[in-house]
């Protein structure tokens, strides 16, 4: 007998309700870092990037500028959930990029664990949201707006087993890079079920008949954004190093071997992780991953009916 599975529309509605339930039961998130009065007073160059004009703020060192929460793709919500990232929507006027964005939707982390202690500051824990496709840029003040500066660029991909993490974790000090003449870009990308769900209903919607890996497509979209826009910050689009740790390192390995990234990456740094780690199943294939996705959605639907 032919198996039935949820349509993509019902899939979306089921997960939307599950997300709302999770938001209600998790603790309130801390407010993301706000720009200080001093950083607002210091003038920052207004830059033209994909989508419109942006301004930033000073770092703790006034010789460093930070452009926080720059959107690199449209919000992956509603009809764009479980779709490849779409072009960012243009805005009017100047967007003030002086606060970090929400992180990708994920479970609450254990702050007493090694990962919680080493990588996260509970006082600056950002909010969680599906609207998470943003990046951050640290650059020397003298380079911002100077397209001839040609500084080297590093794009950092955070770890977290593809289930947790965000672009401004405390282990990555953007000011330290910028003070040494290197522009640092850190990114958010979709995680867990929002970034890597495979399901027959989703596979049926695209010409490749495949689903999943939306988080990796987010990373590629961010990389393309960097190539197209980093000169505005004083960076060299032909000298981009992609770096990552743990799941971020596995992501780097995937990007450097993907034909979609051909010509975009100059160098790579792979820290504590690779393409084939213990958390990567060597037996994973389309049928098994879609079956796992169907099982998860069936469980969500049953819990909703109780």
Question: Where are the regions that the model predicts?
Answer:
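A glycine-rich beta-to-alpha transition motif near the start of alpha/beta enzyme domains, typified by
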Residues: 226
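Non-catalytic accessory segments of hydrolases
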Residues: 2, 32-213, 237
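Bacterial N-terminal signal peptides
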Residues: 17-28
């Amino acid at each position: 007998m032919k198996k039935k599975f949820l349509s993509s529309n019902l899939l979306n509605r089921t997960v939307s309700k599950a997300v709302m339930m999770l938001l209600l039961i998790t603790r309130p998130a801390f407010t993301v870092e706000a720009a200080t009065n001093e950083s607002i007073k210091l003038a920052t160059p207004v830059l033209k990037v994909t989508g419109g004009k942006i301004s930033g703020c000073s770092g703790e060192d006034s010789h460093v500028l930070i452009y926080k929460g720059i959107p690199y793709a449209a919000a992956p919500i509603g009809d764009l959930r479980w779709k490849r990232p779409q072009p960012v929507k243009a805005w009017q006027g100047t967007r003030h990029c002086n606060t970090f964005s929400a992180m990708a939707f994920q479970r609450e982390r254990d702050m007493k664990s090694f990962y919680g202690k080493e990588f996260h500051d509970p006082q600056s824990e950002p909010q969680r949201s599906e609207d998470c496709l943003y990046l951050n840029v640290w650059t020397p003040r003298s380079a911002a707006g100077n397209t001839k500066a040609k500084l080297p660029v590093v794009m950092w991909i955070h770890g977290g087993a593809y289930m947790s993490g965000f672009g401004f974790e405390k282990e990555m000090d953007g000011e330290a890079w910028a003070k040494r003449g290197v522009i640092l870009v850190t990114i958010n990308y979709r995680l867990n079920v929002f970034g890597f769900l495979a399901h027959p209903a989703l596979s049926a919607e695209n010409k490749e008949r495949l689903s999943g890996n939306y988080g990796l497509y987010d990373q590629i979209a961010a990389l393309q954004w960097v190539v197209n826009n980093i000169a505005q910050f004083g960076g060299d689009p032909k000298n981009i190093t992609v770096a990552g740790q743990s799941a971020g390192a596995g992501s780097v390995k995937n990007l450097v071997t993907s034909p979609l990234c051909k010509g975009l990456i100059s160098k790579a740094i792979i820290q504590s992780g690779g393409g084939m780690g213990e958390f990567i199943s060597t037996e994973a294939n389309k049928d098994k991953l879609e079956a796992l996705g169907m099982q998860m959605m069936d469980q969500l639907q049953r819990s909703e009916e109780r």
